[in-house]
């Protein structure tokens, strides 16, 4: 794997912007989907694991005016990017950053909400740049360890939301079940009507619940589907 930094382009949303940076991860549809889909009503304290540029924290801060959000990342470039994006947002007073490994960091309280776009390449060629490798590969944050840590940090009635590709998501859910998690919500995402499901959005909790299942298709022909627009229109400029 070649070392180095990866410059990512900036991205402007309706109420905040993501500046160009060396964070290693550009704004992705996965992240926007998760930030728009995750439900944190009745939550007070949210933990954003692997915040990167701070996208998920900013989306949740926009959606939930009562949330106090702690964002963590192991990468220094990500911390710099998130700090810049937070400081220029309308919600900077509710956004806190911590630099370090979430498996080792000490927190003063538990969280009733967790959001995470986890790494998901378990094998194969590593990403070219160091930051992208950290963001994309499970070498630095294995899924079983992530789930165990989330159990420690989540309140008994809290909720943890994730997005993963189909295969990795199914494996993640199997691990979660083995650890005693319960699947509260599940959304199967397809890029277009004739394409197979390629992403899973899901909410896990430690309390028992009946699973609510739904489907989402991103594109309908040459345009975004009505369901995708409804989900994301508070964020994308051209919706």
UniProtKB/Swiss-Prot annotation:
Reactions performed catalytically: adenosine(37) in tRNA1(Val) + S-adenosyl-L-methionine = N(6)-methyladenosine(37) in tRNA1(Val) + S-adenosyl-L-homocysteine + H(+)
Compartment(s) of residence: Cytoplasm
Molecular function GO terms recorded: nucleic acid binding; tRNA (adenine-N6)-methyltransferase activity
Keyword Electron transport: no
InterPro entries to which the protein is assigned, alphabetical: DNA_methylase_N6_adenine_CS, SAM-dependent_MTases_sf, Small_mtfrase_dom, tRNA_Adenine-N(6)_MTase, tRNA_adenine-N6_MeTrfase
Key word Methyltransferase present: yes
Pfam families: MTS
Keywords, sorted A to Z: Cytoplasm, Methyltransferase, S-adenosyl-L-methionine, Transferase, tRNA processing
Its EC number(s): 2.1.1.223
A GO cellular component annotation in the UniProt record: cytoplasm
GO biological process terms on file: methylation; tRNA processing
PANTHER family reported in the protein's UniProt record: TRNA1(VAL) (ADENINE(37)-N6)-METHYLTRANSFERASE
HAMAP family, alphabetized: tRNA_methyltr_YfiC (MF_01872)
Function recorded in the entry: Specifically methylates the adenine in position 37 of tRNA(1)(Val) (anticodon cmo5UAC).
Homology family: Belongs to the methyltransferase superfamily. tRNA (adenine-N(6)-)-methyltransferase family.
UniProt-recorded name of the protein: tRNA1(Val) (adenine(37)-N6)-methyltransferase
Taxonomic path: Bacteria, Pseudomonadati, Pseudomonadota, Gammaproteobacteria, Vibrionales
